């Protein structure tokens, strides 16, 4: 018989799997680990809109820095 902890872990995996499917449909380019981290941050009180803004800014900066490296 699975323990309550195992059941919680399985339920969490299923939630992340569903979120990953939605994420893929929306072309967010977030993997399961990144989604899991985002969920944890939101559960701990981080504003989801602020988190989305930070992710977009980090991606923008990353693509700009890759452009600089590739252009040299």
UniProtKB/Swiss-Prot annotation:
The keyword Metal-binding does not apply. It holds the Pfam family MOZART1. Its main location: cytoplasm. GO terms for cellular component: cytoplasm; gamma-tubulin ring complex; interphase microtubule organizing center; mitotic spindle pole body; spindle. Signal peptide: none annotated. InterPro entries: MZT1. Keywords: Cytoplasm, Cytoskeleton. It comes from the Eukaryota. It is found in: Cytoplasm, Cytoskeleton, Microtubule organizing center, Spindle pole body. Belongs to the MOZART1 family. Part of the gamma-tubulin complex. This is Mitotic-spindle organizing protein 1. It comes from Coccidioides immitis (strain RS) (Valley fever fungus).
């Amino acid at each position: 018989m699975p323990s309550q902890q195992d059941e919680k872990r399985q339920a969490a995996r299923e939630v992340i799997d569903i979120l990953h499917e939605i994420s893929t449909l929306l072309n967010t380019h977030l993997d399961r680990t990144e989604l899991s981290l985002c969920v944890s941050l939101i559960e701990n009180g981080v504003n989801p809109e602020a988190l989305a803004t930070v992710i977009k800014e980090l991606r923008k900066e990353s693509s700009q820095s890759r452009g600089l490296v590739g252009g040299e």
